[in-house]
Amino acid sequence: MLPSTARDGLYRLSTYLEELEAGELKKFKLFLGIAEDLSQDKIPWGRMEKAGPLEMAQLMVAHMGTREAWLLALSTFQRIHRKDLWERGQGEDLVRVTPNNGLCLFESQSACPLDVSPNAPRKDLQTTYKDYVRRKFQLMEDRNARLGECVNLSNRYTRLLLVKEHSNPIWTQQKFVDVEWERSRTRRHQTSPIQMETLFEPDEERPEPPHTVVLQGAAGMGKSMLAHKVMLDWADGRLFQGRFDYVFYISCRELNRSHTQCSVQDLISSCWPERGISLEDLMQAPDRLLFIIDGFDKLHPSFHDAQGPWCLCWEEKQPTEVLLGSLIRRLLLPQVSLLITTRPCALEKLHGLLEHPRHVEILGFSEEARKEYFYRYFHNTGQASRVLSFLMDYEPLFTMCFVPMVSWVVCTCLKQQLESGELLRQTPRTTTAVYMFYLLSLMQPKPGTPTFKVPANQRGLVSLAAEGLWNQKILFDEQDLGKHGLDGADVSTFLNVNIFQKGIKCEKFYSFIHLSFQEFFAAMYCALNGREAVRRALAEYGFSERNFLALTVHFLFGLLNEEMRCYLERNLGWSISPQVKEEVLAWIQNKAGSEGSTLQHGSLELLSCLYEVQEEDFIQQALSHFQVVVVRSISTKMEHMVCSFCARYCRSTEVLHLHGSAYSTGMEDDPPEPSGVQTQSTYLQERNMLPDVYSAYLSAAVCTNSNLIELALYRNALGSQGVRLLCQGLRHASCKLQNLRLKRCQISGSACQDLAAAVIANRNLIRLDLSDNSIGVPGLELLCEGLQHPRCRLQMIQLRKCLLEAAAGRSLASVLSNNSYLVELDLTGNPLEDSGLKLLCQGLRHPVCRLRTLWLKICHLGQASCEDLASTLKMNQSLLELDLGLNDLGDSGVLLLCEGLSHPDCKLQTLRLGICRLGSVACVGIASVLQVNTCLQELDLSFNDLGDRGLQLLGEGLRHQTCRLQKLWLDNCGLTSKACEDLSSILGISQTLHELYLTNNALGDTGVCLLCKRLRHPGCKLRVLWLFGMDLNKKTHRRMAALRVTKPYLDIGC
């Protein structure tokens, strides 16, 4: 017989278990079955499965003793969200655990709590803490809250793609907002990959390790899970072992509900496994501490309005917003390191508090990581393979799964289908549909439940979500619920269908299982409440990814879909007014009117919203107001899909630009490799090609939009198959495209056959840019078959950095000999060498050739090429512009070239010889050209060591009455103040020289003042003088300012 104390404990424990409902008792048993506390004394599931409350109490006491059974029961009560039983149990005589009254900082929905007995054997401080962190974070509750689904974090976690940025995104955006970067996403052109292990390591830009790392990610990107994984890996000895002695996790979500003052000591104590610990030892080395501040964007708005006096002492008690603000501003414990996670909407506020943080962005799952996640989620390999095969056949949804939250939702829904024995059904195409799919799947009849389960007081649910969103509030108490007609019973019912989740640490607080679900319901509120709610949401949003309403507005557009509207009405009884669509269309029309029919600022955000609608008429009407559409820094395959999908409906658009970012296909910005070389990066390029449907959409756009005359695709990984599909549209009779740019689009030589057919069939196409593609000589030969065809009307072709070698000269010469329409040819960055140039010149000298502009920059040309070019200039009277920059021509080469330039039949107007290793000797020949050539108007000699002597020689030509030069570049030519005497003389005589560029020359104050004196003369015709890069005193600057007043049309740059 048991002792009386044990009998009392057994009886009391059974009364607690009797208070559990049937579902809760089953959950209790399942958690008990996976509890590591039991070690070898786990109770066999066969004995627990049918046991009632009394039998369960007897089994627990028999297996582990009365007190241990109580401690484990209390821990399990927390896990099944019975905080009332846990709190009451603390008063039992057999349980002597002092409750922790400090701040609760561990997020309730993500970590399975494990209490540490105060009587546990005393260990080293760090070892004790690591044990606790390991137990705290090694298990996580699945958000779907199915009975017993507490999974191992390490088994579920899948590595995310992280990139670091090389400059502050806010500064970057401000600097370039008026130039070409209209969206914060464009900062990605200056990113590079980074691993979690090196977040706090120095790099080429930071010789010292960063003290603050900001980890940014959109909704559902896995910020909190990554933060939890950092905690677990540190505790397991896999991360930051030589860097941080202690890592503490602070949940901003939980901080919001704290209204008491606390100190850093209280903050750390609340993270510690037991109370009363002295933190003096920890504070001896604050540089060895890391604070993870998770969810900065979830902080209540009052935090951002917090004012000093700030907290300066770690023992000083202050309101939480002051304490955290002091920590982030580095006024408190400036030596500690911080890892802060946030959504984009809070970045500007956060960066206003920080100095030189390392900025890292989560881009989600790569394609391989998505596959890995599915196998981790489904323990059954067969199920995982089946689901993966299904999703691979439905590419848009698989692409959307780059967002971890979407991957989880999709896996949860498909797992439910598999477990119910159903065939995998057609799945949704948009984010809105994915969330609706999940919501309705939760309300499907479960075993033993006969009917579809609709949550009570649906209107109250969506109004609660909306009010929380407007006030940026994510935790709700019973008073909040009552305000919207909800009570505990309503919420408990909804918990059963897994939309709400009750906080583990605080009985009175409720929250949606993920912020994105709150945003989904808030969108429903706007759709159901008509014009005013929609107008307010759109006005505050403004199509900015940094706005806290971004995802809500995306969902709002998705709910406008007619099929979605009918679905809501049929299953939930919700009716969306047609006025909502009218309001949205009117708002877009106003946006077009205010931006001059150009969609650039917020373009990707708007297209993403329209993609959610999935209705041709609506999208076409919305985009009919834009003649120019420019989308920059498209960073994922899904974003590419969104853009191409909407491009089909841009029926009024004349110019369409789609620019991918450096990581839009998961590849670095490397130069192209020689064709035929199958390296690892070549394999990666093939693996990361955009799906065929992307090119098919664009093909449809070019053949259905008769207004479209310019299509620019930059960093769009089309590949050969993508080009083949696009060319189908280009060959269509209704295609009116004139300008096609396919720069850095992973095009190989094999695709040139399709391009050749397109330039033959499409007589409207006059400009083609294939720069930065691995075309090679074989590809060029295929392309040239089309370029020299009699039907080809191409006038300009750019082939920069296309791996064209000497043999390419023969094919190009053949084109020039047959195509009289081609007037511009850009071969920059191709190693043609002298032999290739010799072949090219055969075509240039052909009587059919009408080429006017030729770029030969960085083509590995030398002196021999100058001789061939000289003979060409004597015969070709159509060539007006020649760029030979960055070729090792030398003085001797230019002197040979001048023989052709001096010929009476030479009509060249623009010559660029920058960085050609020229000295003063070359100026002799150039001066002689200026004395006889009346056609030459622009001359660039920048970055050549001409010196003052060179300018003196050049001046003889510039002062000659025959010289008609209008623009002269002499940047970085080694000129001094002595050269200004010759320059002044030239400006006093020349009546045609209008622009003079002298940047980065040491003219000095004396020389510049001499020039100013000449410029004041009314006979001086100069209109542009650039003097940047010179150390001039204030007096000289005042003289130039006075000169601008005298001649307001004069552009003086300094």
UniProtKB/Swiss-Prot annotation:
Interacts (via pyrin domain) with ASC. Interacts (via pyrin domain) with FAF1 (via UBA domain). Interacts with MAP3K14; this interaction promotes proteasomal degradation of MAP3K14. Interacts with NOD2; this interaction promotes degradation of NOD2 through the ubiquitin-proteasome pathway. Interacts with HSPA1A and HSPA8. Interacts with HSP90AA1. Interacts with TRIM25; this interaction inhibits RIGI-mediated signaling pathway. It comes from Mus musculus (Mouse). Belongs to the NLRP family. InterPro entries: DAPIN (IPR004020), DEATH-like_dom_sf (IPR011029), Leu-rich_rpt (IPR001611), LRR_dom_sf (IPR032675), NACHT-assoc (IPR029495), NACHT_NTPase (IPR007111), NLRP_HD2 (IPR041267), NLRP_innate_immun_reg (IPR050637). GO terms for molecular function: ATP binding; protein-macromolecule adaptor activity. ATP binds at G217, A218, A219, G220, M221, G222, K223, S224. GO terms for biological process: cellular response to cytokine stimulus; dendritic cell migration; ERK1 and ERK2 cascade; negative regulation of canonical NF-kappaB signal transduction; negative regulation of ERK1 and ERK2 cascade; negative regulation of inflammatory response; negative regulation of interleukin-1 production; negative regulation of interleukin-6 production. Residues 129-201 form the FISNA domain. GO terms for cellular component: cytoplasm. Plays an essential role as an potent mitigator of inflammation. Primarily expressed in dendritic cells and macrophages, inhibits both canonical and non-canonical NF-kappa-B and ERK activation pathways. Functions as a negative regulator of NOD2 by targeting it to degradation via the proteasome pathway. In turn, promotes bacterial tolerance. Also inhibits the RIGI-mediated immune signaling against RNA viruses by reducing the E3 ubiquitin ligase TRIM25-mediated 'Lys-63'-linked RIGI activation but enhancing the E3 ubiquitin ligase RNF125-mediated 'Lys-48'-linked RIGI degradation. Keywords: ATP-binding, Cytoplasm, Leucine-rich repeat, Nucleotide-binding, Repeat. LRR repeats lie at residues 821-841, 850-871, 878-899, 907-928, 935-955, 964-985, 992-1013, 1021-1042. This is NACHT, LRR and PYD domains-containing protein 12. Disruption phenotype: NLRP12-deficient mice exhibit attenuated inflammatory responses due to significantly reduced capacity of dendritic cells to migrate to draining lymph nodes. They also gained significantly more weight and a greater percentage of body fat than wild-type mice. NLRP12-deficient mice also exhibit enhanced disease in a mouse model of multiple sclerosis. During viral infection, augments host response with greater type I interferon production and RIGI protein. Mainly expressed in dendritic cells (DCs) and neutrophils. Residues 211-528 form the NACHT domain. It holds the Pfam family PYRIN.
